Amino acid sequence: MDQTTEYIKQSLLNVEKSRREYQLFDDIFVYVKDQLPDHINLKNVLMSVERIIPYHLSKEVDGIYVGQFKDWSEREVNSMFKDASIFVTNEQDDDEDMIDDIIHEFAHSIESPMGDIIYTGGELQQEFVGKRKRLYFLIKSEGHDVSSEKFMNSEYDEKFDDFLYKKIGYEILSSIAMGLFITPYAATSLREYFATGYVEYLMGDRGYLMKVSPALYKKIEQLIGEIDED
């Protein structure tokens, strides 16, 4: 490669690195507040998200913002959905890690407008609480002094979250929860149970999700539109 060609190539790369604004589905504004590491290809990430997410399930998001945001370091947050926007950290391991974070927040974006499908009827909550009960007995059998009351609450509880991840520990929880929850994080709350299942359905092993969480699997299929609600 001659010097002129190399110069042009490098100039184009530099322009792409400095780019701040993108579009997703032609109607979702994407803004890079803080620069991504060199190994992350944001164009590839966004193209993958467009391919994975059904368009009709993307309409609750107006914008995606990439960077570091207030109070995130204390809360150890990678992403969040708030005010019709997805906020995602620029500190990503690889493209797939970032795709996972974005799709996870798209899941949260549809919880309220599609709650009649996701939560009405109680099947999903019943499945989740049943798994929480089994998790309680499994953790207790490991010698941990735990109260059953916290395990019956399907809402997010920061103290319970700290108990799972700081006292029990991710590795032990992963081992205990294997075959019960698709990921340890799915045990955190009913909302995270749904969101992690949504990611697994779209990016992971659908057969495993159907086996481990059949009620959750059916709810997601209803959302995708592949089967009737009945």
Show where each model-derived region lies.
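Non-catalytic architectural context of zinc metalloproteases
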Residues: 1-37, 65-69, 99, 161-178, ...
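Auxiliary, metal-adjacent structural segments of Zn-dependent hydrolase domains
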Residues: 16-95, 120, 140-148
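Exposed alpha-helical structural elements
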Residues: 41-48, 52, 134, 159, ...
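Short, well-structured alpha-helical interface segments that form or flank functional binding sites
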Residues: 44, 59, 93, 97-105, ...
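Catalytic Zn2+-binding segment of zinc metalloproteases
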Residues: 99, 105-126
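Pan-zinc metallopeptidase signature
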Residues: 156-230
